[in-house]
Amino acid sequence: MLFNAVHNSLPPNIDIDHAILRGEDHPPTCAKCVARVRISALGSLDLRYHSLRCYAAPPDVGRCEFVPPRRRVLIANQGLDVSRLPPTGTVTLLLADVEESTHLWQMCPEDMATAIAHLDHTVSEAITNHGGVQPVKRYEGDSFVAAFTRASDAAACALDLQRTSLAPIRLRIGLHTGEVQLRDELYVGPTINRTARLRDLAHGGQVVLSAATGDLVTGRLPADAWLVDLGRHPLRGLPRPEWVMQLCHPDIREKFPPLRTAKSSPTSILPAQFTTFVGRRAQIS
């Protein structure tokens, strides 16, 4: 098998289909994987798949990260760093913006200019430290987007951002996991749209997650962090409501007003003030 040829060893419980070697311009087929498999194609066309690395990954890792041949030609010609390219396949997106950004710019433009410069540095450092990729420096206005192959890394990054002093800025952060599409190295499609709508529900200082992301990070949260079930809420312009969770930690604010939505579907078993705690058995006991 390919892994054996490259690394002189065979990872347990993984059977990689030999179709990987065909150089096709779509993600390779992976069969009989006990864990999800992350595939990274590195190097130039001369190396082809010699530097392809296949390895078992924890369950919160996206299904597949694959650089097709035509894109590798562009990478080689432009001298780009493959590790900093936006991941594709199943990823967790972090989308954040500055609460009341327009008002802050009007009231204290000089302070905001300094704060935004500090924010840019803080965001870039946090994303890099947690293995994420920022496709563009700015997404819309004072918002930004980052992509992570591990949902737990996205949650840790969001937590670090909220724990950092950014005054007078307060960030609203939304996390969602799903299939993504790239167009001119920018994410488009339903996954980023849903992430943006989740972020719009949040208040400054708050991190909200979709049910998909919440499932992936349960049991893999940073130390002392936990999730709170906020119930199911409609998302503006989207047909399907979302079950929303909040990422909490002793170092950040926990109590917020109701989410920024016109109405909530009364599907939670308990009232909002008695929401379900997830991943906090030790503190509760």
From Swiss-Prot:
GO biological process: cyclic nucleotide biosynthetic process; intracellular signal transduction
Source domain of life: Bacteria
Gene Ontology CC, one term: cytosol
A Pfam family reported for this protein in Swiss-Prot or TrEMBL: Guanylate_cyc
Record-level Gene Ontology MF annotations: adenylate cyclase activity
Residue stretches making up the Guanylate cyclase domain: 92-199
InterPro entries documented for this protein: A/G_cyclase, Adenylyl/Guanylyl_Cyclase_3/4, Nucleotide_cyclase
Family: Belongs to the adenylyl cyclase class-4/guanylyl cyclase family.
Protein name: Uncharacterized protein Rv0891c
Native species: Mycobacterium tuberculosis (strain ATCC 25618 / H37Rv)
